[in-house]
Amino acid sequence: LKCNRLIPPFWKTCPEGKNLCYKMTMRLAPKVPVKRGCIDVCPKSSLLIKYMCCTNDKCN
């Protein structure tokens, strides 16, 4: 699986066991990503932070 880094078009190949791409954004500024990368379990969103997870190459 390949996931985008914080600044596309840079990306990285995920290590074994981390099979989700994720994007973390602040709810007040949803268009500005704070973090991107590979993750094993999609975290729960909170009042301030929203997580978007997906399973396709470079989908974050």
From Swiss-Prot:
InterPro entries hit by this protein: Cytotoxin_Cobra, Snake_3FTx, Snake_toxin-like_sf, Snake_toxin_con_site, Toxin_cobra-type
Gene Ontology CC annotations of this record: extracellular region; membrane; other organism cell membrane
Assigned keywords, A-Z: Cardiotoxin, Cytolysis, Disulfide bond, Hemolysis, Membrane, Secreted, Target cell membrane, Target membrane, Toxin
Quaternary context: Monomer in solution; Homodimer and oligomer in the presence of negatively charged lipids forming a pore with a size ranging between 20 and 30 angstroms.
Single GO MF descriptor: toxin activity
Other remarks on this protein: Positive charges of Lys residues are necessary for cytolytic activity of this toxin, but not for its binding ability.
Similarity remark: Belongs to the three-finger toxin family. Short-chain subfamily. Type IA cytotoxin sub-subfamily.
Organism: Naja nigricollis (Black-necked spitting cobra)
Record-level GO BP terms: killing of cells of another organism
Compartments (UniProt record): Secreted; Target cell membrane
Name the record gives this protein: Naniproin
Cysteines joined through disulfide linkages: C3-C21, C14-C38, C42-C53, C54-C59
Role: Basic protein that binds to cell membrane and depolarizes cardiomyocytes. This cytotoxin also possesses lytic activity on many other cells, including red blood cells. Interaction with sulfatides in the cell membrane induces pore formation and cell internalization and is responsible for cytotoxicity in cardiomyocytes. It targets the mitochondrial membrane and induces mitochondrial swelling and fragmentation. Inhibits protein kinases C. It binds to the integrin alpha-V/beta-3 with a moderate affinity.
The keyword Secreted belongs to this UniProt entry's keyword annotation: yes
Tissue: Expressed by the venom gland.
CDD domains in the cross-refs: TFP_snake_toxin (cd00206)
Main location: secreted
